[in-house]
Curated annotation (Swiss-Prot):
Gene3D superfamilies: Porin, LamB type (2.40.170.10). Coiled coil: none annotated. The record marks 31, 66, 99, 252, 385, 447 as: Greasy slide, important in sugar transport. The keyword Ion transport applies. This is Maltoporin. Residues 1-25 form the signal peptide. It is a multi-pass membrane protein. It comes from Cronobacter sakazakii (strain ATCC BAA-894). It catalyses: beta-maltose(in) = beta-maltose(out).
């Protein structure tokens, strides 16, 4: 009995050590932003985005509280073989009250197995919901290559001259498909599965400090058995991507060329859309039946550079032309810079200047917007990428819009529903007109 009692403290200590080791192995990562702002003409902070533009310049121009909370852990390891479990829950609220209830979005839940195939050392096989090899322009929060969703694949297969990745993901689309029951009664399905098949060849060393990544995505609607899509629904499409990344000191430059067809032109990032036919012709979702047959061309140059000890700068230039057979496409180009002057290793001043120009294919009219933000910031480090950051800001925006999208009524009583129309069409007001505004506030931003 005495021996048993003497062993008890040792057993407790060992178990405590095991649990402590397990607890420390949990990876807690994430992103969050939140703040408070006001509008010069009164009321809460407004945010400014040109009608038809796919994104907006974000510094001093974000009006929500948003967070992604990631928990992950390497749950098994033997030699160089391992399994990793990863999760991500995201939240977004309007930051107008203390208590703002919201249903979180379960963005990620996947398992990644590394070096499990002896013939393919260094590769990873995975399955589940995942943020998959996303490519974005941080300044405008624009994801130009992103097939995230439930899926499976194998990545980083070393071919000697580059690394191969293959994946399949899904994004179901509201609107759905229909089947005939009897006596002219149709049963409408609430969603249609859109499958995407993605192949990438990366890490191609093409010049000193420069690498090339090539990719192709094919997306298609996958209607249930005995269901059908609308006659004019877009059923499939392709997207081709080439991205060159050049190291410039401690910074980088990325040059991107993308070409997409049909179903992959709407979101323009590799996910398929355009298969739905709607619940009924009185439901706004019926507008999804407007097909997006056509093509998209996109050119992007963006990056971040350091100019001495005191100056950093982000920049972006982009041209995007969506040409649809139904003439409801757009031609959008944007250019912006965000220089940063560092007073101390943790205090800086930032100036963001951005311009958007969006021309409607249908109306031949143009919307444009200028946006300027001056911010004083305290951040954890002396890089333009250092976070967390606390900032106070003032933003000025001026816009002149000649067209907008007609969302009057519903598709059953408005033949133009969802289409671009000129401002003043049928006596209505479409777009934001010619105006300007300024806002000011404070914000925190963090990633870890």
């Amino acid at each position: 009995m005495m021996i048993t009692l003497r062993k008890l403290p040792l057993a407790v200590a060992v178990m405590a050590g095991i649990f402590a080791a397990q607890a420390s192995a949990v990876d807690f990562k994430g992103y969050a932003r939140s703040g408070i702002g006001w509008t010069g003409s009164g009321g809460e902070q407004q945010c400014f985005q040109a009608t038809g533009a796919g994104a907006k310049y974000r510094l001093g121009n974000e009006c929500e509280t948003y967070a992604e909370l990631k928990l992950g852990q390497e749950v098994w390891k033997e030699g160089d073989k391992s399994f990793y479990f990863d999760t991500n829950v995201a939240y977004s609220v309007a930051q107008q009250n203390d208590w703002e209830a919201t249903s979180p979005a379960f963005r990620e839940a996947n398992v990644q197995g590394k070096n499990l195939i002896d013939a393919l050392p260094g590769s990873t096989i995975w399955a589940g919901k995942r943020f998959y090899q996303r490519h974005d322009v941080h300044m405008i929060d624009f994801y130009y290559w992103d097939i995230s969703g439930p899926g499976a694949g194998i990545e980083n297969v070393d071919l000697g001259f580059g690394k191969l990745s293959v994946a399949a993901t899904r994004s179901s689309e509201a609107g759905g498909s229909a089947t005939f029951q009897s006596d002219s009664i149709y049963d409408y399905n609430k969603s249609t599965a859109n499958d995407v098949f993605d192949v990438r060849l990366g890490s191609l060393e093409v010049n000193p400090g420069g690498t090339l990544e090539l990719g192709v995505d094919y997306g298609r609607a996958n209607a249930r058995d005995d269901y059908y899509l609308a006659d004019d629904a877009t059923k499939d499409g392709w997207m081709f991507t080439a991205e060159h990344v050049q190291t410039i000191g401690t910074g980088f430059n990325k040059f991107v060329v993308q070409y997409a067809t049909d179903a992959l032109t709407s979101q323009g990032k590799g996910l398929s859309q355009g298969s739905g036919i709607g619940i009924s012709d009185t439901d706004p979702k019926f507008a999804y039946a407007q097909n997006n047959n056509g093509h998209m061309l996109r050119l992007i140059d963006h990056g971040s550079i350091s100019m001495g000890d005191r100056w950093d700068m982000m920049y972006v230039g982009m041209y995007q032309d969506i040409d649809w057979d139904n003439n409801n496409g757009t031609r959008w180009w944007t250019v912006g810079v965000r220089p940063m002057f560092k007073w101390t290793p943790i205090m800086s001043t930032l100036l963001e200047v951005g311009y958007d120009n969006v021309k409607s294919q249908r109306t031949d009219e143009t919307n444009n917007q200028y946006k300027i933000t001056l911010a004083q910031q305290w951040q954890a480090g002396d890089s333009i990428w250092s976070r967390p950051a606390l900032r106070v800001f003032a933003t000025y925006a001026k816009w002149d819009e000649k067209w907008g999208y007609d969302k009057t009524g519903n598709p059953s009583n408005n033949a133009n529903y969802g289409y671009a129309v000129k401002d003043g069409f049928n006596g209505g007001s479409f777009g934001r007109g010619d105006n300007d505004e300024w806002t000011f506030g404070a914000q925190m931003e963090i990633w870890w």
